[in-house]
Design a protein with these regions (language model features):
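Catalytic core of the metallo-beta-lactamase
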Residues: 6-14, 108-169, 185, 189-193
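Divalent metal-coordination and catalytic microenvironments
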Residues: 11, 21, 59, 66, ...
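Active-site metal-binding loops of divalent metal-dependent hydrolases
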Residues: 22-24, 59-60, 119-120, 150-152, ...
Length: 282
């Protein structure tokens, strides 16, 4: 499991290489010269990735679905996407696309099944396509159970996911892009709500994502892992049950030694950093 920034992970399990929400462009914007520029560059080149078997897309916002990256990956992987995304891929002459609605599933191999799971968010890529495509999280069910939350606000759907498919061995949960709360609450969880998701789905361990790659909202770029640690402490939870990785760091799920978190190395640097720059029942 390697964090490649924002919501992008390289997941290697059961003989498959999966990518989640891959974005290698500098700006997450419909215009190449306008919009948020990266705070951190990708930790590797696209050409340095292993052969990718499956790409999971959570929704069509530009920080999660990137034209440049998808064009580079081409028709080699299978793309698993929420309902309403197939036409976008087909325009790129990419046809290995599996669309799903919430609670649908698809067997990607004899031992791995992908499930489309609820999230609370929205979709929009142009002026004319508000809410025309679905958004989702994903479950990967094989020798281990993985949950990828995608982009989401907090909702009761996570209790449903936990009741139906928990516990999960590992969860990838957003912890950043949450201020101001009165505007962002319905679409982006904060670290407090992220910990609640961790508990709702019965995650044994979780990794924080959706932070530190672009400065998209008002909180300090390195605040999310601090607030995450504070929330775990306030609930008397083991700090190793939910942690943040360095960009480009790899975490082995069976590794029981020290976990490479970012909090210790970042707290002392904060003052020097800019504040802002198939069917159900699978």
């Amino acid at each position: 499991m390697t964090w490649l920034g924002h919501a992008c992970f390289l997941v290697q399990m059961d003989g498959l290489n999966l990518l989640t929400d891959p974005v290698w462009s500098d700006r997450c914007s419909p215009i190449s010269w306008l919009g948020p520029s990266r705070y951190r560059k990708p930790p590797c080149k696209l050409s340095e990735l292993p052969q990718i078997d499956v790409v999971l897309i959570s929704h069509n916002h530009y920080d999660h679905l990137d034209l440049f990256t998808i064009r580079w990956l081409g028709n080699s992987p299978i793309y698993i996407v929420p309902d309403g995304h197939r036409a976008w891929f087909n325009k790129l002459k990419i046809h290995r696309v599996i669309e799903m609605k919430w609670w649908d599933s698809y067997s990607i191999s004899p031992i791995v099944k992908i499930g489309c799971l609820p999230a609370q968010h929205w979709s929009k890529r142009t002026t004319f396509d508000d809410m025309k495509a679905l958004w989702s999280g994903w479950g990967v069910f094989g020798s281990k159970k993985l949950f990828f939350a995608g982009d989401t606000g907090y909702c009761q759907g996570f209790e449903q996911i936990g009741d139906k498919y928990g516990p999960f061995d590992l969860a990838l949960i957003p912890i950043g892009a949450y201020e101001p709360r009165d505007f962002m609450r319905c679409q982006h969880v904060d670290p407090i709500e992220a910990v609640q998701i961790h508990q709702d789905i019965g995650s044994k361990q979780s990794i924080g994502m959706h932070w530190g790659t672009w400065v998209l909202t008002d909180e300090h770029v390195y605040e999310p892992p601090q607030k995450l640690a504070q929330e775990l402490a306030s609930r008397n939870l083991d700090p190793t049950c939910f942690f943040a990785l360095h960009h480009g760091a790899t975490y082995h799920t069976d590794w029981k030694e020290e976990i490479p978190t970012v909090l210790e190395t970042l707290v002392s640097d904060l003052d020097a950093l800019p504040q802002r720059a198939t069917s159900s029942g699978f």
